Each structure stands twice: as C-alpha cells, then as structure tokens.
C-alpha cells in the first residue's frame, strides 16, 4: 500500500466492519489495509505510509484516542487526515477526538456511502492545501509553513497543526481582518458535523486561540464579533527567507 492519495489504513476490532469497508472502499478505487489492534496499526504505519487513517475508538489493546495523539506527534504522519469511528453516543468522546486532532467523526452504525463521501472530502482538502502551499505566511509573532503545517513563534517554539487546526488558521490567514461567520468556518474546516455547528466552531476557535497564546477574557488576535462570527485582527504577509 503506497501513500498515493488513495491508500487507507483502518483499525477496528469488528471483523464484519473491516471486511465491509475493505470491499466497499476497494470498489471505489482505494487501496485498503485493515488491522484489529492498535499495535498492528502502529506497525503498519511504520512500515508504509497511508493517505488517510480510520480509527475505531474502542480497541482490545488501546483506544483510538491514543492512536490519534500518536499520529499527530510524529512529523512524518502529522498531516495525515484522520476519521474516528465510535459506537458510543457520548458527546464527550467526540469532543475528545476532535480536540486531539481528528478531522472527522462518524458514529456507528454508519452508512459506507457517507463514510466514502467524508473520505473524499478530506483527501480533496489535503490535496488542495498541498497544491496551494509553498509559502510561509507571517502574522504578528508567528509564521505558518503551509506545506509542512508547522507553526513557528519568534521565541523558537514550533509545533505541527492537525488537519482541522491548520485549515482553520489558513482560512483566517486567507481572509485577514474580515468577519467569518460560523457557516463559512464549518464549511472550510470540515464537512458535515457530528456536533451542533455552533458548538464545534466555537470549540475549534478556542483550540486555535490556545495554540496562538491568544487566551483571556478578550482575545486580541482572533476576535469574537458578537452576533456575526470571528475576525483575525492581524496583518498577514509572505515571510521572506533570509
């Protein structure tokens, strides 16, 4: 399985789901490899990259949250889109997954057709950011590398942004000093949501503010425009390498 934009690695301890998705996604033109344990998932990604990961939350040896965290902590894997699956109806599970950097979340039972649509949407978004990338954008005390998804502060701190966090910051940088409503933010950062739109957008903005050290009662960089949405109150410019 090669990371050619059409390869998927799935981990789920339900054999019927694995077989169903292997068949369905293969017919849609994807190369699919599936495993039943977290340890096997880690080994598979160490051996060969994938274009997208599908993680079941509940596994025999560990949970999908730890796998999501592990992916986002590795430079080689940090930008890979992640979809999480869960049989739980607990909203807290979904919030945790998204906060850890998952790009989308789907509850069981689910429609393979809907999963396929979400996979295609995430891969299109990943490809789009790669095509448009190449520049380093500077704003305030920060620089964003739009290819590697790395965010740098002038004090030397740097870290990787998950797909959702990167998409949100890139949206603000593409529209500086413009009010963006919640619909615009939701549509740009991920497709259909498993949580109420207002909740998911506010949570995503809050997470990005923490990354940018823009916390407190009156955030200065990403400002809330009451009744309208959010605004990036900063000048954005290309960063010229010395």
UniProtKB/Swiss-Prot annotation:
UniProt GO cellular component terms? cytosol; protein-DNA complex
Cellular compartment(s): Cytoplasm
Q: Which residues are reported to carry the modification 4-aspartylphosphate?
A: 56
Q: GO molecular function, one example?
A: transcription cis-regulatory region binding
Post-translational changes noted in the entry = Phosphorylated by GtrS.
Inhibition and activation profile: Phosphorylation of GltR induces its dissociation from DNA leading to transcriptional activation.
Annotated S-S bridges: none
Q: Residue ranges of the Response regulatory domain?
A: 7-123
In Swiss-Prot or TrEMBL terms, this protein is called Transcriptional regulatory protein GltR
Species, as recorded? Pseudomonas aeruginosa (strain ATCC 15692 / DSM 22644 / CIP 104116 / JCM 14847 / LMG 12228 / 1C / PRS 101 / PAO1)
